[in-house]
Amino acid sequence: MKDTVKNLEALRQAMRKSHVDAVIIPGTDPHQSEYTSAHWKLRDWVTGFTGSNGTAVVTLTDAGLWTDSRYFLQAEQELEGTGVTMYKEDGGNDPTTTEWLAENLEEGGVLAVNGLLFSVVQASRLEAFCGENGFRFATDFDPFPEIYADRQALPLDKVF
């Protein structure tokens, strides 16, 4: 929990430096795999949530984690005391990530992602969402080389 609070603050400092108001951090790698090498567990590092499914959204003042029903209990336990709120992806009255952003990001705000971690379709949808809501969309935000000092290197193992 202590590291999560520290990691969230490091991310927020990088956001301020880059003039980013919100960032989406998926739990996937550039191949859209839910089961990633340690190098790509960026959402885990920021939120403390270690389940294989989940998306984090962080603003300068709030943070949320969206996950499916397989991980509701785990997420509640791992997020306790971190300042990250759990939202249910499938069921209940919780907002979607974009509904939450529409309520928590001011017009003209910058929503940023690391474009390597999103498919063209996902990025296009986010770009359209931003346009409809008066937000700016950036796909080149990757603060982790600077803020995640002990991040594991990319694996060099053969795929097959």
Where are these regions (language model features)?
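N-terminal accessory/capping or targeting/presequence segment of soluble
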Residues: 1-107, 114, 118-160
